[in-house]
Amino acid sequence: MKDKKILIIGGSGFIGSAVSSILKKNNFITILDQKKPKIDNVKFIKGNFFNSTKIDRLIKKNQIIIVFAAISNINFANKNTVKTIEQNTLAITQILEKIRVCKEKKKIFFPSSIYLHGKNSDIYTISKLASELIIISLCKKYKINYTIARLPTIYGTFNRAEDVISIFVKKASKNKKIMIHGTGKQQRNFMHSEDVANAINHLLNKNYNNKVISLLSDQTLNILNLAKKIVKIIKSKSKIKKLNKAKRYDDFNFSSNRDIKEGSKLIWKSKNTIEKNIKLMTKS
């Protein structure tokens, strides 16, 4: 994909920054965000998707709309239900309505979560699932092209320091106890932000129009083994403590690719491993 005008809403954030860094090489990138991005050679507009005048103008000028702006902290989401629905679901509806009235054909790219495949529900996954259903319904009705990518647990460059790897590395670096909810057997599929960015570039390049794709890496670990791996690599004296036998009601588990329908997944080979990332984090 080359020479496309792409609007990235929330492009200064963790995943948005990584994707912007890849896409800017061959395209014209505009980032709409509250904070200035840490990357150069992109156009920055301060604001959010509730700035109606700005968003109208930017959507009209761009061909592809990528929406990363959302509440992604699960604990915050569970405590702020209304705000989460407003920012994660209502905003998507408003963006689609603005795309609908444009004369030129647009495409929307929406990052969702592979943990929608799990049995447990919380306000974060509910907001993502609701957004997916709204996108599929409205895009079909208004003939708007879309791609929905269900993303795994992401770590790496531009990290927001709220993911499980960052939390465990910080504890282990200070030889503090690493706390685990439940048995620690809950599995996660992990993917580096640069690998995610390259995979999203691939999804935008190839014919994935009007599809929901589960993006997976070749790195799946349970939480207990992740903690042990981090302690070993860092050579930490940290002890691993299980807080209780029962896991949190809203905890996710990625048990198997078998839960994901054939033909709707993309397995991406990791160039940036967890081990390599842990070593880099301890040096920084």
Name what the model sees in each region.
Residues 9, 32, 65-69, 108-114, ...:
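SDR active-site strand-loop-helix element
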Residues 6-25:
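N-terminal Rossmann NAD(P)H-binding glycine-rich loop of SDR-like oxidoreductase domains
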Residues 67, 90-124:
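Conserved Rossmann-fold NAD(P)-dependent oxidoreductase catalytic core, especially the SDR/UDP-sugar
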Residues 38-51:
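Rossmann-fold cofactor-recognition segment
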Residues 49-86:
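NAD(P)H-binding glycine-rich loop region in Rossmannoid oxidoreductase-like domains
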Residues 172-284:
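C-terminal substrate-binding subdomain of Rossmann-fold SDR/epimerase-dehydratase oxidoreductases
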Residues 112-113, 133-157:
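Conserved beta-loop-beta element that borders a ligand/cofactor-binding pocket
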Residues 127-130:
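Active-site helix of classical SDR
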